Amino acid sequence: MTGLVDQQELEKRLATEEDSQNEDIENQLPSIETIINTYREKENRRVNLRFKAIGRTPLLRKTVFSINASQRFEKVTRFLKKELGLPMNSSLVLYVNSSFAPSPDEIVGNLYDNFAIDSHLLINYCINVAFG
């Protein structure tokens, strides 16, 4: 009889410990509302872009613009062509921090998060390929 009581007691303790562990895990996870609010903030976030011409490329009168962080980089290219008065089928090469040319489907917010300097993402632009 003692063995049966000990086993029942042990099962109760294990069940209690498991319940407390589950509660701890639930307390560590963010609520659905928190997750949704974080997503909405990222969707509505705007980032600053600073444009700088390379070589004989036309200059912009205003060099700092703001864009929604969820936009793809191709939107930046189209916007800049429009601002410079270039035809949409013309060549325009954009570089981030004079280092690399991002893919048109890259998300602007990701570039900003990884390469922004002084709260601006520096975009160098030119009509011809400037760097290898």
Curated annotation (Swiss-Prot):
Keywords: Autophagy, Cytoplasm, Isopeptide bond, Membrane, Nucleus, Protein transport, Transport, Ubl conjugation pathway. Disruption phenotype: Impairs atg8-processing. Signal peptide: none annotated. It is a peripheral membrane protein. GO terms for molecular function: protein tag activity. One of its GO terms (cellular component) is phagophore assembly site membrane. The keyword Protein transport applies. Disulfide bonds: none annotated. It is found in: Cytoplasm; Nucleus; Preautophagosomal structure membrane. Its main location: cytoplasm. GO terms for biological process: autophagosome assembly; autophagosome maturation; autophagy of mitochondrion; glycophagy; macroautophagy; piecemeal microautophagy of the nucleus; protein transport. There is a cross-link at residue 132 (Glycyl lysine isopeptide (Gly-Lys) (interchain with K-148 in ATG5)). CDD domains: Ubl_ATG12 (cd01612). Forms a conjugate with atg5. Ubiquitin-like protein involved in cytoplasm to vacuole transport (Cvt), autophagy vesicles formation, mitophagy, and nucleophagy. Conjugation with atg5 through a ubiquitin-like conjugating system involving also atg7 as an E1-like activating enzyme and atg10 as an E2-like conjugating enzyme, is essential for its function. The atg12-atg5 conjugate functions as an E3-like enzyme which is required for lipidation of atg8 and atg8 association to the vesicle membranes. Plays a role in meiosis and sporulation. Belongs to the ATG12 family. This is Ubiquitin-like protein ATG12. It comes from Schizosaccharomyces pombe (strain 972 / ATCC 24843).
